[in-house]
Amino acid sequence: MVMEMIAAADVREDDEDYQSPLDELFERLELRNPESLAVKQYKIYKQAAGKTAKSILISVGVRLAAFNLESIAGLTATDELELEQVGERKTAIFCVIPDNDSTFNFIVGMLYTQLFQMLYYSADIVHDGELPVPVHFLMDEFANVALPDEFDKLLSTMRSRQIFVSIILQNLAQIKALYKDSWESIVGNNDTLYYLGGNEQSTHKFMSEYLGKETLDTNTFGKSSGRSGSYSTNYQQAGRELLTADEVRLLDNDYALLFIRGERPIFDKKYDILKHPPYP
């Protein structure tokens, strides 16, 4: 529909009085609803000179070119997901994207943005602050999807509305590339951090620092012999990382590190999903 409207728009630089089919469409809309936001925004666009208006149309057409594809147009033509039911009843939505081509990953990003907006509206306006059915986002391929603006702020406010997120990354370098100034805030807004292992240096260093230090008690004994022999004992305390960055790198593949807010770090064996009872 949007691409049809863009196709109906036409600008003639030598004839400012020319009316395109899209101009006529907005005129009819203004007759029905003079206060329409769409009409007000379109009037702002129409203030542009012919050359500028044509440039705007070309830019919009290029940015939305993917929607000219029949498959994408068919996918987005009608609403079949019933997003308004998420948070109202038990629902599962699977968004599968290829790991070797990010061309259409923006569609999942659009879904995230729209869904977060609807969930916040439902929680705040319809249900007085909290969704009746908790919603959990499992964000695999987190670094490869366009996320809503100010996602770090959403992350700090969503839990009170019964909206939860699990962010899955290959390493910390991915989130640092996406959120150069706020990646620490995103990590800090997660109450649980589960490290399965990896081979990226800055991640090893971060995990080592996150684990903290242990205190080592050292007793040193000294003895000298001879006519004036003596005996001495020296007691010292020293700090050491629970795991150095190199030890984190060499972490056994069967083990993982678990950090839960307010608890000491946990070094435990990974769960074998194949042993889970419902596993087919």
Task: Give names to the regions the model predicted.
Residues 1-163, 178, 238, 246-270, ...:
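P-loop NTPase motor domains
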Residues 155-257:
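Conserved ATP-driven motor cores of ASCE-family P-loop NTPases powering translocation/secretion/packaging/pilus
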